UniProtKB/Swiss-Prot annotation:
Record key words, sorted: Glycoprotein, Membrane, Transmembrane, Transmembrane helix, Transport
Cited Pfam families: MFS_1 (PF07690)
Membrane topology field: Multi-pass membrane protein
TM helices/strands, residue ranges: 52-72, 89-109, 125-145, 149-169, 176-196, 209-229, 275-295, 312-332, 354-374, 379-399, 427-447, 448-468
UniProt name for this protein: MFS-type transporter traF
One Gene Ontology term of the molecular function aspect: transmembrane transporter activity
The protein's role, per its UniProt record: MFS-type transporter; part of the tra gene cluster that produces terrestric acid. The clavatol biosynthesis cluster cla and the terrestric acid cluster tra are both involved in the production of peniphenones and penilactones.
The keyword Phosphoprotein is assigned to this record: no
Subcellular location: Membrane
Family designation: Belongs to the major facilitator superfamily. CAR1 family.
Annotated gene: traF
Organism: Penicillium crustosum
Amino acid sequence: MTSGTEQATLNTEENGSDSDHLSKEPIAMPALDWDGPTDSNNPRNFSTPKKVFITACLASLVCISTFGSSVMSPASGQLIHEFGISKELSILATALYVLGFAVGPLLFGPASEVLGRKYPLSVGVFLFAIFSIPIAVAKNVATIFVCRFLCGTFAAAPLAIAGGGLADLWEPLSRGIAVAGFASATFLGPVLGPLVGGFVTKSHLGWRWTQWLSIIFSLVFLAIYFVFCPETYSPIVLARLAKKRGQMPPGGKVDFKQLAKVYMLRPFIMLVQEPILALLTLYMGFIYGFLYLCFEAFPIAFEEHRGWDIGIGSLPFLSITVGVLIGVVIIIVHTMTRMRRKLETVGDAPEERLVPMMIGSILMPAGIFWFAWTSNTSLPWAPQVVSGVFIGCGILLIFLQGMNYIIDVYKVMANSAISINAMFRGLLGAGFPLFASYMFDNLGVPWAMSLLGFLCVALVPVPFLFFIYGERIRKWSKFTAH
């Protein structure tokens, strides 16, 4: 069975890269295979309810890790009052966590290739919970900032690993639907964080309970995942089965030097040499940074300018949530109709992934400009809140389909492409909130958001460019499977 062998053999060489040792996967596992196409041990052959359950568990852990990134954003005022720090310094509680998202994939990506999905993911979530405890009882801001960075680093484990877990379980067409639902959790987490954090911070519980809630949620869902979900990474599953049966052939060996080269060097080479990866990483990084900037911009617009309290002021984030869910529906409909027909007739159609992304590239700046020019306090609040639906839908469509396109284009090289993409996103996600207050204070909400809208408009051509010329560009690359 060819597909089983391809999944189990991680030292595959890519087309056009024979002379490039960095194109080889770093783990020389023995060539093992399943006992036929219906082998029940193959994660692809799990029952649909079992696949859905595992997917839901992975989505829950991703949601919790991203929820933790923004849940403290409404606590800036209390941090300023309690520790006597500036507003700009208080934003580091969010920025350092997101910076950890840039570092974590460099650790957990290689770990998932050597140890499988389950144990690195579980260790990461557990350590995230452990390092949240010092924040909840912190007596100084240094403890908060250091531990927030560590929390973000370990919380990156689900972000770095869960996508691979979905690829283990689902065939390409079904995976498109599973990933769409999964992606909603990725974005619902950071959007719901300020909503929950706002009401918790405002209540008698105070800001420290934002951390206790994160700890409780993460440990409960981690326990469910660890107890009920099996390992899904085929090479590891096959190796364990062979060892159990006494059939493990010699040659299973990890080359840690090559592992370091592949994960530390190849992603940067790809970013420089691959126009598809470079432009999509720039676009997705901007979108990610803008999302985290919203956690500072929305309170300025609704709490400072319209005079809403911290709890009510977090409710407009629900409009982004609605937009995210609409985006999920759009992707599912596209996958089951146009994408399905394309796969049936052509067999491989990466550029078809860009159709929803093109829609999102129009919706996103439209929502930003709408938000900007309905922010005047003399206007009703409702139109400004509704703009969040277009922003949320645009964010989801651009980000998710950009990620799907990268995976389809680079295939087994996708881990390297995604790791550099995640690192760049994390840097922008951490950086954007830091200049938000300066920009909005100096330019005002209308022009600050309009500036971001113009930058977003400048990136609109990206999906259209690759939809038209993507196939031709892929033929130039030594990292893609043409």
